[in-house]
Amino acid sequence: MNNAIGQNKKKILPYPLVDEIGESITSTEKVANKFCKYFTNIGPNLADKIAPASKSFQDFIDSVPSDSLSSFTYVTAGELKTMTTGFKDVKAPGADNIPISIVKRTLDLISDPLLSIINLSLSSGVFPDRLKISKIIPIFKSDNASLAQNYRPISLLPAFSKIFERAVYSRIFQFLVDTDILFKHRFGFLPGHSTSHALISFVKKVANAVDCQKYLAGIFLDLSKAFDTLDHAILLSKLEACGITGTAHQWITDYFRNRIQYVQIDDSKSDALRQICGVLQGSILGPLFFIIYIKDLPACSSS
């Protein structure tokens, strides 16, 4: 039973944290609340420190393409089976404590009602509120383990949420490919365009420049907490500029509306807090939304 519900591994607790005055926080409930408050405020706090830009992001948005994605096509029974069986069983359960392995084993029994719910969601532009709850697990990175900033949040989403997201991902991604919207030199989070491909392309350009006895100059930027600071309103504007409109755009808008998250440490849960910006690390749609969000960066930098 433990293997089936993903609870066969020994839980490892984070180190005791320290508060603002340097005193240790040992209560798992207080540690969970400390983490949740920190993770929830990362994006808004960083966004408040960003200096106003001299130009609006709208100045760099390309004209709306002639083709548009105004609605999502329905998911078929075959597609649902392919999507669901494609998930790995090792995925930890989300807030509903239902691991994907259970969904896969019972898919033949729940396929019809699940298919109806997914297609109703896609056609109405509404994402179920029960699937907007994220369970956050703090993962230690490095340095001082008693400081919350040295942990990164991993979002454990409901298994059904991931199925919804995978259906929407495939439709948005195919539309972007068909309309050739994505910048061709964009690497990361794309099939056939990994960071390894970026290194190969970069080394090739450097080698060619050296062979031609040209001077080389490079600018490398680190986008601090990039996923956490993503502005939902800006993303939605860029999605519309890409041609994603109608109920498809409504669905994405509702996907971000009233999302909440909590941190769990052992059996202790923090208070649930609302997520007001950013995309979830651990979600399927998050990386794709981030790609669209920074799509016009080359146009901005070239000017």
Across the structure, where does each feature detected by a protein language model lie?
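Conserved polymerase palm-domain catalytic core
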Residues: 223-303
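Surface-exposed loop/turn segments and immediately adjacent short secondary-structure elements
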Residues: 2-150, 163, 269
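Active-site palm subdomain of RNA-directed nucleic acid polymerases
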Residues: 168-186, 287-303
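Generic structural signal for well-ordered alpha-helical scaffold segments
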Residues: 2, 173, 203-208, 294, ...
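Short, residue-level hotspots on alpha-helical faces of the histone-fold
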Residues: 105-112, 116, 120, 162, ...
